[in-house]
Amino acid sequence: GHGDSDKPQTDYSLGGFASHLRDLLDHLGHERVTIVGHSLGGGVAMQFAYQYFDYCERIVLVDSGGLGREVSWALRAGTLPGAEFVLPVIASRHVRDFGVSATKLLRVIPLRPRPSVIEVARGYASLADAPARSAFVHTLRSVVEPGGQRVSASDRFYLTEGRPTLIIWGALDTIIPVSHAYTAHAAIQGS
């Protein structure tokens, strides 16, 4: 996510995240879990269920990545060559201050920004930090390309058989379209 945890130079692939999660569960002594994933975390949850099937008791996917090609233009733009040089400008204090002022102005007139716009702005603010920006770009490029998502779990839905799967989605999600939820629901038996 866009939190304050360390951003080491490491493997930011879905398989890497799934392996880190398995290592954490082993360290904590958990043998069976309900895995919950939101956005990229949904992709991690599905990768975890694929790699470490026996650990996975139930799966919850919230506005999950990895279920279709379409994603927002902003994510696709973040994969373009040079994005790592443009992101510091977008995340700069001046641009953020302008965005805050514009949001306040929009609240005065009948145009109200969607909550997702505000959330995206908060996410971009975290990219002012160079290690966070590097981790974001590496992670994004491992799952998205300019044409959309490059990884898909659709060929592995059979692995959810016998595992209760809950799919939750916001109908107005502007990052990953809700159509992915309907497609996954139709393909995942018992979801």
Please name every model-derived segment:
Residues 26-32, 53-54, 162-163, 189-190:
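Active-site acidic short loop of glycosyltransferases
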Residues 50-51, 56-93, 97-98:
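Flexible "cap/lid" loop of the alpha/beta hydrolase fold
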Residues 1-40, 72-75:
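Active-site loop/oxyanion-hole signature of alpha/beta-hydrolase fold enzymes
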Residues 98-115, 120-127, 139-145:
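Helix-loop "lid/cap" segments that line or gate small-molecule binding pockets
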Residues 21, 25, 35, 63, ...:
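Generic structural signal for small/hydrophobic residues in well-ordered secondary structure
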Residues 127-186:
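Conserved serine/cysteine hydrolase catalytic core
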Residues 44-48:
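Hydrolases whose catalytic domains are alpha/beta-hydrolase-1, hotdog thioesterase
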Residues 1-3, 66, 173:
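Alpha/beta-hydrolase active-site loop signature
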